[in-house]
């Protein structure tokens, strides 16, 4: 509201007098002011004048927004299709889009010995020609419908995914079923795919992050363990894989009575059942017994104290602290999400705030725990400028020790609960994310209501629960340190840790030196306190 100026006669006269007085004073030039009379002193008993009161916000105090309520993920409808396929369906009719993910428990852990990457190669070949169409014709048909069909593989399972507008669902679902149930496996296409695959494996050797991930598995599980090799194999194993290996693996592993199809979006159960009968009716399970799913045992130590992949003259180094984790079905998983978020799972986590924000050693320090049918891994890591490798490693270990010994703060309890609620809501924002997330659950052998029950347990975890998990899974005392970088910059940390020499490995995790890293009378206890960050200067 605007305040109006007074327009009364008295006000007009007063303004005119003031203006006239000002004009006369200016025209006549400056005059010497009379000395001001001294202010009378207040009587001794007079109290000091009260301070001016602070301005009062007319809107009142700013209200604090309430904490977001916990979101309870819906449980998908479950039924069995013709041929024995298990189907999970979560209907979402707000947007005319449908997304489906089919998963088979045939991931890298199912690779035959010496054939690492076979599950990956098989999944990659599924959309390189299927049904009546070769690779180019199939790709064109998918594009014409505005659909997206892709394949993927991880340690436990392989996947085929479809996302398409509702109006093109029937035609796209027919192509989707061709990819899953009727791949062509043409030798010429395999030769092309294999050549690209081998080039990707060569380029992986130059990527320190990819190298580190390969080494984690090799160190933690060992070459003989089903989880001990990378999902996409190695340069050596890729050479041994032929198209006949792919056909044999597919015939054994890819069958409808092992498959779970997860669909989310604008489709009803009768509509989906009709599509399955139309497109997948010819996909029959063979009479041979169903292959047992692979659930690897926990890795067995002892593990080396420090492992190094020597990268001379590298501008950056990867530093990591590696420990065995838990399976996806372990009861620790709900609380472990929040513990990991506090130490390294988000930008505001302890590791990132220290190594990035306070010390400036890295663009980001993180931690994660893997989700697998069998034992997982817990790793905390950062990419650091090379000449800061040793102090950054000291700081990383120090942060982990303090976290394991002191547990989480009340602020971290509240923050991780809020972030957990927000993340699960984000998962259910799009049908593509829903289908992919639930297919991941199915691939791990988790029940359809796992998201609902786990989100409640995660939300209910208290400080004492999180403290116990921090101590159990993030204490670096008996962990393995993995470094991808120059040996010379690591020596200071080795001396502090009492390790005479690191175990040397190549980019595929193979031991290349027989020097075992022997502790000099102590485990990986807290290193000397890292230098305090210097105050910023202009």
Language model features with spans:
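M16 family metallopeptidases and their MPP-like homologs
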Residues: 88-90, 94-127, 133-181, 194, ...
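Non-catalytic, conformational "gating/processing" segments within enzyme and secreted inhibitor domains
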Residues: 213-214, 243-279, 477-480, 487
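C-terminal motif of bacterial Sec signal peptides marking the signal peptidase cleavage site
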Residues: 24-27
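Post-signal peptide N-terminal segment of mature Sec-exported envelope proteins
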Residues: 34-71
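Bacterial signal peptide processing site
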Residues: 29-31
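N-terminal secretory signal peptides that target proteins for export/translocation
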Residues: 1-11
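An aromatic/glycine/proline-enriched structural segment found at the starts
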Residues: 57, 62, 223, 227, ...
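Mature N-terminal segment immediately following signal peptide/propeptide cleavage
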Residues: 64-106
């Amino acid at each position: 509201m605007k305040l109006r100026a007074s327009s009364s006669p008295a006000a007009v006269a007063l303004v005119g007098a003031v203006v006239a007085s000002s004009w006369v004073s200016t025209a006549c030039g400056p005059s010497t002011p009379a000395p001001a009379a001294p202010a009378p002193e207040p009587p001794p008993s007079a109290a000091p004048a009260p301070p001016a009161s602070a301005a009062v916000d007319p809107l009142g105090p700013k209200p604090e927004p309430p904490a977001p309520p916990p979101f309870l993920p819906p449980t998908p409808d479950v039924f069995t299709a013709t041929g024995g396929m298990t189907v999970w369906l979560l209907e979402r009719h707000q947007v005319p889009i449908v997304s489906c993910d089919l998963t088979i428990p045939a991931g890298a852990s199912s690779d035959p010995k010496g054939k690492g990457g076979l599950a990956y190669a098989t999944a990659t070949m599924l959309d390189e020609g299927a049904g009546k169409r070769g690779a180019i014709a199939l790709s064109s048909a998918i594009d014409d419908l505005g659909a997206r069909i892709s394949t993927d593989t991880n340690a436990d399972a392989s996947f085929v995914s479809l996302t398409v507008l509702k109006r093109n669902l029937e035609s796209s679902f027919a192509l989707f079923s061709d990819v899953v149930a009727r791949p062509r496996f043409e030798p010429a296409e395999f030769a092309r795919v294999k050549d690209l695959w081998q080039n990707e494996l060569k380029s992986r050797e130059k990527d320190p992050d990819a190298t580190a991930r390969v080494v984690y598995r090799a160190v933690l599980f060992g070459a003989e363990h089903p989880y001990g090799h990378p999902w996409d194999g190695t340069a050596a194993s890729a050479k041994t894989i032929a198209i006949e290996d792919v056909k044999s693996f597919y015939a054994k592993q890819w069958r409808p009575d092992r498959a779970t199809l997860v669909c989310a979006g604008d489709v009803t159960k009768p509509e989906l059942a009709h599509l399955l009968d139309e497109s997948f009716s010819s996909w029959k399970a063979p009479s041979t017994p169903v292959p047992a799913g692979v659930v690897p045992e926990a890795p067995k130590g002892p593990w080396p104290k420090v492992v190094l992949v020597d990268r001379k003259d590298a501008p950056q180094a990867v530093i990591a602290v590696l420990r065995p984790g838990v399976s996806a079905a372990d009861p620790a998983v709900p609380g472990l999400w929040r513990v990991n978020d506090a130490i390294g799972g988000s930008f505001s986590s302890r590791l990132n705030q220290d190594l990035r924000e306070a010390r400036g050693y890295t663009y980001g320090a993180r931690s994660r725990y893997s989700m697998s049918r069998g034992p997982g891994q817990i790793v905390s890591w950062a990419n650091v400028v090379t000449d800061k490798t040793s102090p950054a490693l000291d700081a990383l270990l120090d942060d982990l020790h303090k976290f394991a010994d002191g547990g989480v703060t009340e602020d971290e309890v509240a923050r991780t609960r809020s972030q957990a609620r927000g993340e699960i809501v984000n998962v259910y924002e799009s049908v593509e994310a829903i289908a992919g997330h639930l297919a991941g659950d199915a691939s791990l052998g988790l029940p359809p209501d796992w998201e609902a029950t786990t989100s409640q347990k995660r939300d209910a975890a208290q400080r004492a629960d999180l403290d116990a998990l921090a101590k159990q899974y993030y204490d670096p005392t008996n962990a393995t340190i993995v470094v991808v970088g120059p040996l010379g910059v690591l020596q200071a940390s080795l001396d502090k840790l009492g390790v005479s020499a690191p175990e040397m490995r190549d980019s595929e995790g193979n031991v290349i030196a027989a020097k075992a890293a022997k502790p000099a009378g102590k485990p990986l206890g807290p290193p000397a306190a890292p230098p305090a960050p210097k105050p910023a200067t202009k």
